[in-house]
């Protein structure tokens, strides 16, 4: 079976974006709880290569996951920050390859661009539902590319958003976000700078293509005491979106400790400064059905992405 980018777009239309996002959130939440409960294995850290001689040209990484007696799925994903401007392609592209456990044969190939964006948005929805203040309604976005759409889509399922403030270095891209997000009736405001977008926000998503060494993209100034931050843009050594001071005073949750320390926001921290792993919070919430006390303090979710 071969599913192209066009095929995945068509599936979204046939099944419905809301239905797919809700199902992804539900299955991911269940799966994370199963990892924490010992019913599923945690995937190994991803491996890959930095592209080119200069920092910021991109990376290509491999993310494997095997289900016993079923098969192995290998996602190869490439991050090329200039892809959109030079090749009219998304900055994140890749492929999902499914191998049979019985025969070892390649059984299916699927373009990974849309599934990756949906999965990342679903993870943000889960992390935010646990760490953001209940009733959060003001969302800030720094970065308005493809990922920003599914980030907002996931959040729209978990929260009743009424205002979205967006900043992007490309003003046209920021202006176009409203029409790309027909799933929400929230009011959209385009900010002149990142700090204006963040001012008064309950939830912040940073989804940028900042070059290694060029961050952070926001300052540690005038942040709401209860602000929850989802940082999804850090994916290689030297590339960070947040000031270290935010991480050092926040409750920090990661999706994969080894990856976060190697290439996520937490690459500037020591292991003991990481407070939680997402699957443990999901498992705890499922077992005890209680609100976490961290929802009233500054929290950060360091999202690096992992096979599942």
Please provide the spans of the model-predicted regions.
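Rossmann-fold NAD(P) dinucleotide-binding segment
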Residues: 212-227
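Glycine-rich Rossmann-fold phosphate-binding loop(s) that bind the pyrophosphate
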Residues: 143-145
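Adenosine-phosphate binding glycine-rich loop
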Residues: 9-16, 236-308
